[in-house]
Amino acid sequence: MTTEDKVQELTANCLRDQLGWQSVYAYNQEDYGENSLLGRQNQKEVILKRYLKQKLREFNPNLPEEAYNSAILQIEEINSSQTLLATNQEKHQLLLDGVQVSYRNAKGELIRQTLKILDFDQPSNNHFLAVRELWIQGEIYLCRTDLVGFVNGIPLLFLEAKNLNRDLKAAYDENLLKYIRTIPHLFAYNAFAILVNGIDTKIGSFCGKYEHFHPWKRLAESDPGIVDMETMLKGVCDKNNFIDLLENYVLFDNSTGKTCKIIARNHQFLGVNQAINSVKRWREGGIKDNKLGVFWHTQGSGKSYSMVFFTRKIRRKLGANYTFVICTDRADLDEQIYYTFAGSGLTNNEQELCRASSNEHLQSLLGEHKAYIFTLIQKFNQTVNPDQPYNSRNDIIIISDEAHRTQYGTLASNLRAALPGAGFIGFTGTPLVSNDEITKRYFGDYVSTYDFQRAVEDKATVPLYYDARGDKLSIAVNDLNEQIAAKIEELEIENVEIEDRLERELRRDYYILTAPQRLEALARDFVEHYSTAWETGKAMVICIDKLTCVKLHNLIDRYWSEKIQQLKKDLKKITDDQEENYRQRQIQWMEATLTAVIVSEEQGEIDKFQKHGLDITIHRSVIKNGFELADGKRISPENAFKQADHPFRIAIVCAMWLTGFDVPSLSTLYLDKPLKAHTLMQAIARANRVNEGKTNGLIVDYCGILKNL
């Protein structure tokens, strides 16, 4: 049972016998014409019009024939000037919304009507057909696909099988990529691509990198998890799951300026559906205290997209009147989550205001029945009269994103008084720590969990390794970490500029951490360490405050230049050709590398930095204007750092980019800021994203804080 044919056969049999699909073997049995096996006129057709027209008639009865024919023509039509991904996005939206046709009724009146293509409410009403070994003619080449899954005649599933001895990447490289080039019109409609070899199996988007294909190991969140073909097929191709995934768990995100097709991972599908079941219980009166639960999916596992899936499915399936208030406690996190929602097409602040700029503006937005409102919890800074709430509707859901530090106290009390009928759900990438009863008190128990270990096992994230370099260099401040971390958290919650307060209130502790000789040692070690790890990816350095960021930047800049000069001197002594080539590439990489300080703006910052002999303006210019590209255009620091091939490789930060900022090519995080447990876990997880060729992330701990995690 190891041949490719047997794997195909087992797959088709599972779809037919266990999941209720029809199954057809087309290789040498298909004929052509209206009454043929599949009703295709020729091998170039990828829409099975026989089944499509049957369902159009069934779902939209008693229309003239011209209406059905017009719908089929629109579904078949492909704009050759578009990219394949743009066409796929267009066809996906057409499936969700239906196809609009015009026809004249018996009275000669022009009627416009939207025809339903798929039944999303009763999945079993759709026609599911698996076709093995289907011949498809491209512009030049004739290709034979292993298995194509049609729903109502539309090719939504592509499955490529290999024998037991072949790696799944061969199915991706040798077949999927080839078919995208040679028979692209098949993928204009594709929802899911599955790769199988009888044991291993992965699902992804046809336009995604292989690294973004993922297993489907569980049918329920409580399952231990097993990688096998049957679990994948039952999890994805069960009729209810397939239609649910198609309708609610596929999105197109252009938040980075480049459109990406996102398919929910196994844990997102299961977790979001559990969260939605919690909302259903709340609506039915089964939850009396408005606590919808805590959604804990470890950092790097797609929590922001899970929020998008959650809100979008609720508005589509439970009612379009719901309002979601996405509440964070940091301006940069608020911006990042807004751009994820906007990039996914759910909202647009430029067209319709949805981002609260003040308490008064927040009150105004809440009175306008918006779909989405984005706010900092600090905007709830006014005491609320319980008899005069901002809005008493019971179809408002508050999503608290990583707000462990601010979900209690005055601001949270104001929030709950302002929206007494709202439901509350907490999304977090870090577990509730042992003494975190406050979180449970406000949100309830876990509604879904996906921990660090599972994420690594599922390859949703890479493992993180730890290097206690602070101890090796004797610059760790082990006994001071907790005290400093507590003070930093206190000041950041108050949303104040922390340098002066830290210096004044911590005094000796602050001076120890920011002592010139300590920063010198740290900068030297960073340059030595990162310059020898130059092939691994990008680096982020986390400092205690803005002043220290700029001080460290200046030191790194100096030692980086010295290191380049030393390597050039050493190059002259090298006699081995391979080593010489390696060193030349290292020098070129170092010379091209850009370093930037990324910190938030504050009033009077020029004078403040000048008092310390520092210049913030050169860094502020980069933050505001970004970097110039070869074509003269400019790219923002955020997008430059996210692009693996852009030479902005070293980001020095103190608070920005520590949460909700995904950079798959970030491989090493250099930590020199004492942080409390939740924030610390969020920060170190910056390095756990999956990327091509990346096997792990590395946390270099200079201050010694990770010992106590």
Where are these predicted regions, by residue range?
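ATP-dependent helicase/translocase motor core
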Residues: 2-323, 332, 336-348, 368-372, ...
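Short, conserved "post-DEAD/DEAH" coupling segment immediately C-terminal to helicase motif II
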Residues: 177-181, 406-423, 687
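Interdomain helical connector at the RecA1-RecA2 junction of SF1/SF2 helicase-like NTPases
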Residues: 226-229, 437-538, 552-574
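Conserved C-terminal RecA-like helicase domain
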Residues: 503-653
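Conserved segment of the helicase C-terminal RecA-like domain
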Residues: 680, 686-709
